[in-house]
Amino acid sequence: MKNNMKKLRLALFSALVCLFLQSCNDFLDVDPKHAASETQQWKTLEDTRSALMGVYGLTRAALADNNTHWICGDLRKGDFTVYKRSDLQAVSDNELNKPYDLLKKVSNWRRFYAVINAASVFMEKAPRTVELDRSYSEQNLKYDIAQVRALRAFAYFYMVRIWGDVPLVTYSYDNGTFPSMLRTDAQTVLSYAKAELLTAIEDLPYQYGTQTNLYYGSYGAQWQGKLFNKLSAYSVLAHICAWQGNYAEAETYSAFIIDHASEINAKYTSIADLTSETGLFYSNASVKGSRILGFNFAHNDNEATQSGHLEQLTLAYPLVQKSYPEIYISKDSLFSIFTNFDDLRFGIIDTIKYSSYYVQNLNEETPVFSKIKIIQDGSAKDNDFGVFGSSIVFTRLEDITLLRAEALCALNRSTEAVSYLNMIRTNRGLREVSFKKDFGNNRESLIAEIFEERRRELMGEGWRWYDLVRRQKLMKDNEAFLRLISSGGIYWPVSEDIITANSQIEQNEFWK
C-alpha cells in the first residue's frame, strides 16, 4: 500500500510539471506557442493517474496562488485588519485597481483556465487508455471523467464569483491555436457548471474503491477528504444555486448532503478538532471525512509550502518566528462578533480567561488568529521555518447546514431554519434559540443571525465576502453595498495582461 501511495505522489509531481507547462502558459491569450505534445501519454493506468492528480494539483494551485482563496474571500471588506501592508489594505478597502503586484496577480484568471484546459484534455484523451491498458477499467474511467468534469465546473463557479462574466471554454486548446474569445454571461456559465455537475454526480461515488477492488491502489477512508465525491458535487451545486438566489434548489441539495453525510463519514466537527494542529485542516486527520470538499498540502507527501496558506498571513510569535501577523482580528472586532461569553470559539473560560481556540496573544496589540495552524506536519516543535501543511477546506457540514438554514429562511420556512441554526449553535456551547421568543417571528432578524453565525463559524475559511454579497441580496439594508452589486463592483477587475493579449476581453465596467 505504501509503495502505491509513493507512486501516486511521484505521479502527482510529474503531472503538475507537465500539465502546468502545457496548460497554463498563455492559455486564452491567443499565443501559438501553447502546444501540448502528448504522443507519449494516455497509454497506461499510470498516465491517467498522473493526469488526474495533475488536475487536482492545478485546482489547488489556483486557489492557493497568492493566497487567492483568502484574499478574495476573507480580506475584502471582511473582519481582518491589515498590519502594515499597503497591498493587503487595498484589498480590504476594495481598491482593487491599485498598482500593486499582488493585485495584478490575483486579477489574472489564467491559473483557472489551466485547470479547465487540463480537465478538458483528460476528458478527451483518457478514453483511449481503456483500449491500451487492460488494468484501466471502464469503471475507473467513469470515476476519473466524473472528477475532472466536476473540477472544471468548480473552477467556473469560482471564477464567476470573482470576475462575473468569463469566457466559457468547453473543450481543450492543446493544438497551439487560441482564438480571441468574448466573455460569456455569468448566468450562462453557472448554468453550464450546474449541468456538468449533475452529469458528474451520476458517476461519482460516495467512497472510492473497496478492499477487493482498489481505486489506484487505495480504497475507502484512504481517499476521504482528498477526492471529489458525490456530496462534493452536491455542495458546489448548492452554493451555485444560493449565489444565483435559487434557494429552492439550494435547499434541496443541502438537504441531500445532510441526509447522506454518513455515506462519506462527514460529521459535525468539535471545537477541538476544528482548531487542533492535527484536526480538520490537517491532511491526514481522523476527521478528514468531514472535509466535504478540500484540497490537501500533506507535509508527509512533501507538499507543505511556505505560501498558499492562511497561516502565512495570520500567524506570528509564539507559533512562528514572526513578530507580527500580516492580518489579524482586532480586539474590538472580536468582542463585537462574539457577543456570548459561552461561545467555545471565543468566550470566557475559568471565570476571567478567554478561550484560545480561535485567538492567541489577546493581551497584545495584534492578537494572533490561530484557528488554523498546521505547521509542518501538525506536530512541529521547531517553528523557525514557516512551512505549513493545512488543507484548503472549501466546504464542511457546518457550512452546508447554515446554507440550508439560509435557504429555508429565504423560502419563508423560518421555524425549520431555526432548527438548523441551533445545530451549529449548540455544538459551539450556545443555547438554542426560538423563532418566536428570540426573533419575534421576524424573518429578517433570523436571516441576519444566520449570517452572523456563518461569520463566527467560518471565519478564516474564505467565505465572508461571498456571504456579505448573498446577505445583501436578501436583506437589502445597505444602500452603498447595493450600489456595489448593481454596478458590478462586487467583482474583481480583469488583469490588464489578459485584456492586452485578447482584444475581445473588456474590463469590468466598474473598474474602467
Regions found by a protein language model. Name each.
Residues 24-76, 96-102, 254, 479-512:
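Membrane-proximal, proline-rich intrinsically disordered regions
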Residues 39, 66-83, 207-309, 435-444:
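Short, surface-exposed recognition loops and adjoining beta-strand edges that mediate ligand/DNA contacts
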Residues 49, 57-59, 87-163, 178, ...:
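Conserved, well-structured interaction surfaces
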Residues 103, 256-416, 472-512:
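Elongated scaffold/linker segments in the mid-to-C-terminal portions of large proteins
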